[in-house]
Each structure stands twice: as structure tokens, then as C-alpha cells.
């Protein structure tokens, strides 16, 4: 559970780097996804897949807004530890 909260916090920190007008959308999107997946099977494999998906989606959004991917380094460390 702690890792899930750390990943969520990492995603929300990245949302703060986005342009002000797009932050509410992505903050809501991230929250809804984390809430929807809280019922997921707690096997290690499925959580790892969700963490990888969160990281990949974060990279896509950063790239969309021309933000350097290195901003997601900490999230990568959390997701793949």
C-alpha cells in the first residue's frame, strides 16, 4: 500500500509541472485511475503492470507538453524498485 501511495504522489508531483489550464484534468484523471484500481487483485504481477502503466502514461503526458522526461526519474525509481 505504501508503494501505491508513493506512485500516486509521484504522479501528482508531475501534474504540477503541467500548464495550469491542464492540471485539473490530469489530476482528476490520475485520481480516478488510482481509485478504480484499488480493487485490483493484489498479486505482485498486476501491481507491477499498473505501476509500469502509470509511468508510461506519465511519460506520454510529459512529452505531449514538451516537458523533459527526466522530471519523471523519481517516479521511475519508485515504480521499478
UniProtKB/Swiss-Prot annotation:
Disulfide bonds: none annotated. One of its GO terms (cellular component) is cytosol. It comes from the Eukaryota. Belongs to the complex I LYR family. LYRM9 subfamily. This is LYR motif-containing protein At3g19508. It comes from Arabidopsis thaliana (Mouse-ear cress).
Amino acid at each position: 500500500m505504501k508503494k501505491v501511495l508513493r506512485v500516486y504522489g509521484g504522479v501528482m508531483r508531475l501534474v504540477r509541472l503541467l500548464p495550469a489550464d491542464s492540471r485539473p484534468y490530469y489530476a482528476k484523471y490520475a485520481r480516478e485511475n488510482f481509485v478504480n484500481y484499488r480493487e485490483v487483485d493484489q498479486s505482485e504481477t498486476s501491481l507491477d503492470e499498473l505501476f509500469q502503466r502509470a509511468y508510461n502514461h506519465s511519460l506520454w503526458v510529459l512529452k505531449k507538453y514538451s516537458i523533459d522526461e527526466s522530471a519523471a526519474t523519481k517516479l521511475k525509481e519508485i515504480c521499478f524498485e
